[in-house]
């Protein structure tokens, strides 16, 4: 559900259907250790999530790529302070958190530019945003109970799709 939440949060798109292929390669494992999920979003966009515990040398690598009609963005967990932006007919642009003109990207950073934010510190930002929301009624930027329910529906549909031979499963009627 973490990957589903990341895709939904970053893209602001709502998943409509999924088609999954989950595999258990390592003998004795109770859960799948490799999987790919094709996604159809409302509005016509398409995507996929690939997750593997057998991809040698990847060491919990997380990356996100979004392609649109005007360009694309790419972010990698291994270089969390960088965002690559490609626009049709333009040179590649590299944005770094904390850089000039990046105040919105720097809001949740406590260290000056050039210092990577830690994975654990990201959770403190979720809690801070949660309490700010309670105090001031600001628009929430943290996962809600409904996001959790949506994540569970996603997982149920993914497992069912794989068990039934990688058929498309609807997420409609959801949260």
Model-derived features: where do they sit?
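C-terminal glycine/acidic-rich active-site capping loop/insertion
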Residues: 17, 36, 41, 70-142, ...
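Short arginine-rich
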Residues: 154-164
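Hydrophobic residues in alpha-helical segments
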Residues: 10, 134-135, 161-162
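C-terminal interaction segments
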Residues: 149-152
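A general structural signal for well-ordered alpha-helical segments in protein cores
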Residues: 3-4, 123-128, 155
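Rossmann-like dinucleotide-binding domain that binds NAD(P)(H)
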Residues: 1-59, 146
